[in-house]
Curated annotation (Swiss-Prot):
This is ATP-dependent Clp protease proteolytic subunit. It comes from Caulobacter vibrioides (strain NA1000 / CB15N) (Caulobacter crescentus). GO terms for molecular function: ATP-dependent peptidase activity; ATPase binding; serine-type endopeptidase activity. The active site is at residues 106, 131. Its EC number is 3.4.21.92. Disulfide bonds: none annotated. GO terms for cellular component: cytoplasm; endopeptidase Clp complex. Disruption phenotype: Essential, it cannot be deleted. When depleted for ClpP cells arrest before the initiation of chromosome replication and are blocked in the cell division process. Deletion of socB permits slower than wild-type growth of the clpP disruption. Keywords: Cytoplasm, Hydrolase, Protease, Serine protease. Fourteen ClpP subunits assemble into 2 heptameric rings which stack back to back to give a disk-like structure with a central cavity, resembling the structure of eukaryotic proteasomes. Belongs to the peptidase S14 family.
Amino acid sequence: MYDPVSTAMNLVPMVVEQTSRGERAFDIFSRLLKERIIFLTGPVEDGMASLICAQLLFLESENPKKEIAMYINSPGGVVTAGLAIYDTMQYIKSPVSTVCMGMAASMGSLLLAAGAAGQRISLPNARIMVHQPSGGFRGQASDIERHAEDIIKTKRRLNEIYVKHCGRTYEEVERTLDRDHFMSADEAKAWGLVDHVYDSRDAAEAGAE
């Protein structure tokens, strides 16, 4: 079966650096990690969450006071995997700036909003989508009832996280997330998901001054 993500990863370019000991080759993502840049791309799932959390913890150990930049292009995915990344972002000492490129949907939008205050950015043509969690269950009626109760608790917790980071009331968040709600970059800024919309590095650097 064709997997576009795996195919793309097999085509990752290499960067060659000259050192005092000769040449050293890095894949492009490892080289960017040296610059404290993390890419969160594709569906959010357990394997990806482990890699993102490991990178966050490593960069904190390198310099706990220096900013980490996380670039997000994700349709969302597994709630527990996304919350593992979220909790790690909040746990570490290093501030994490978030940048949306392409799309941040579902858990992707929550992680975008979870960046350090004043350091949440969207590129101008990015799309952001928020909604309530969904799930399907099979089995005995009592088991289905327990799963339903758990997903309602999860929904409340996710709503509380959006309230915390977006400055909206719980009622506003619940109403907006009731169905798939798509936003432009400017609409996401107005809603409180991001702090800035920049179309160039110069604009971002000028805004940071």
